């Protein structure tokens, strides 16, 4: 679906509108302001003012604004070149981050399990911004050369491994214009939640976690307006950007027709016991690395069981949303058998090896 991202206003006019009559700002205005920044037409004051005003005026809670900013960002993305024969469904599981819980890297691990179970996964991610260890940090620490992955070899990685990691900084180089200012400002802005909206592959189906329940229907509506179908937006009742292992999770599910269905799920739906979130907390990069290796090697310690079950419910739901599993319980069981089989370790090791080979070939 094409979203109009063109406005006749200048950046100065857009900033004035945000400051004085924000109710008159259109999605096209927001996208045009972002384009001016990406094109290098904004000075430091205008850049900081634009980002700050979007946040203070609540534009991050408007689905039309999020969709317009995402569409403009995608216009400048490096788009992977998939092979004509690659018509199979591509999926993702991703969260906004920023929930404050600092849990283990669940979506990263779940994406690997889902790929080993038979789905084709294009995982979009970045370095840590609000936790101790982001998806890119963890994968790199275990031998993946993520900088070697570019638009020209995504198709090959998917063909070989059914898994690829799309490093946001590689595929969205235009975002470098905002990165330093966002860090220096030090508060959340609408750009903090754009990640799930701007996977350059534009997956066919996905599970998207959000850090607060009010953002759930907003994200679902933004995804729908971008043409996404069979996407599920989730938020644990603790304001967790994943499916909770501790209790209930709210789901906003966009079906084939674009209808958004809101319902609640629980670990009981997956045949998995509940655990306190504290039992699934992330730690340092080194600790998370060791935990992932134990999961892949099927050499769990008793303290790993909660994290294992956390992975099962999130992977199981992705398998359910993607149609591989008829029920959530079946999805969790497929995930468990896949993890125990050693297939996930084999996939990860071969994927990491391929990334290093790409680096050698292009270095």
Per-region residue spans from a language model:
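Short, small-residue-enriched loops and turns at beta-alpha junctions
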Residues: 21, 37, 55-58, 97-101, ...
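Short amphipathic alpha-helical face segments that pack within enzyme cores
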Residues: 49, 109-113, 310, 314-317
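Active-site cofactor/substrate anionic-group-binding motifs, chiefly glycine-
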Residues: 58-129
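Short beta-strand segments at enzyme active-site cores
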Residues: 46-47, 122-124, 233
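A glycine-rich phosphate/pyrophosphate-binding beta-strand-loop-alpha-helix module
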Residues: 51, 104-161
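Glycine-rich anion-binding loops and their surrounding alpha/beta cores
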Residues: 2-18, 25, 74-78, 82, ...
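N-terminal glycine-rich anion-binding loops that anchor highly charged ligand groups
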Residues: 3-10, 16-66, 74-82, 310
